[in-house]
Amino acid sequence: SCLFIAMAGFDTPVISGVMEGYGAEAAGLQAGDRIIKMNNYNIHFYQEVTVYNYFHNGEAVDVVYERDGDKHTAHITPIYSDELGKYLIGINGNLDRQKGNIFEVLEYGAYEVKYQIYITINSLKMLFTGQLGVKDMSGPVAIVDTISDVYEQSIIDGVFYVIVNMLSIAILLSANLGVMNLLPLPALDGGRIFLIFIELVRGKKLKAEVEGFINMVGFAMLMALMVFVMYNDITKLIK
């Protein structure tokens, strides 16, 4: 992530303009204001503003922003845009990326990882709550296809953009794998941690055959899910 930030830079959550007739204008936000927090989520990139609104579609939000060194809080209720087909709080941001020194690279590299983990966790929430279907999941086949598409689009602008975009994909995949591996499912590290917790609560170890059976069933379920996801990927490609 630090290499990505060093090469691509980072954008800042500074408002470039306020849309007429939306909540941000009514709350008094202005161009030049820097968004610091949305509800309890700290904002470091402008793209986090967009992603937060996506995962909290239509929900009112308390926005903490900075103007001339002073912090202010605005309560904003999103308004539905028929033209765009989604709820908007009514702000625009400048997505131009800036380069930082070594300390900023380390700092924003950590923020980038946090951002990708946030996306992964909230995507899983949408999956488990039914906002996304199992068919929306993507596996190795879809990932390879995406990488191929990104490469073909990036190489037009040069090798530098290929490297930057591949690094971005690598960060996203790493965050996904890290979060998935910590899920409390048998055959994953999260499942092992869960079993250890059960043993601590019970005050004694599980029998080896019981633990082995649990892991075997969990592994079989994971393999079945992988086959389904790969089938889903191939079906999408054929269509």
Predicted segments with their positions:
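Alpha-helical transmembrane signal-anchor/signal-peptide segments
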Residues: 8-26, 30
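Juxtamembrane transmembrane-helix termini
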Residues: 8-11, 184, 232-239
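Transmembrane helix boundary and interhelical junction motifs in multipass membrane proteins
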Residues: 183-193
